[in-house]
Amino acid sequence: MVHICRLFVVMGMLLCLSAQFASSQHWSHGWYPGGKREIDVYDSSEVSGEIKLCEAGKCSYLRPQGRNILKTILLDAIIRDSQKRK
């Protein structure tokens, strides 16, 4: 009986942890269920400076970062390894 209780506790903890890491849609900021979005027409005066920079191709957060991930991980590992040796 004790093993079954422990099993249920562990399964409950795993369920809670997996819910934290699961991807789900956040229904705010104009999004509605079904993937529908509220359509608003913005005036040109409401366009922020960041959007203007993105239209010019200067926004860093829209650039693909996939190629540099492995390089960054390897460099961090090398730096940590060299710091441990000192």
From Swiss-Prot:
The modification Pyrrolidone carboxylic acid is found at Q25. GO terms for cellular component: extracellular space. Belongs to the GnRH family. It comes from Carassius auratus. Residues 1-24 form the signal peptide. Its main location: secreted. Pfam families: GnRH. Keywords: Amidation, Cleavage on pair of basic residues, Hormone, Pyrrolidone carboxylic acid, Secreted, Signal. InterPro entries: GnRH, Gonadoliberin. It is found in: Secreted. The keyword Acetylation does not apply. One of its GO terms (molecular function) is gonadotropin-releasing hormone receptor binding. This is Progonadoliberin IIA. Olfactory bulbs, hypothalamus and telencephalon, midbrain and posterior brain areas. The modification Glycine amide is found at G34.
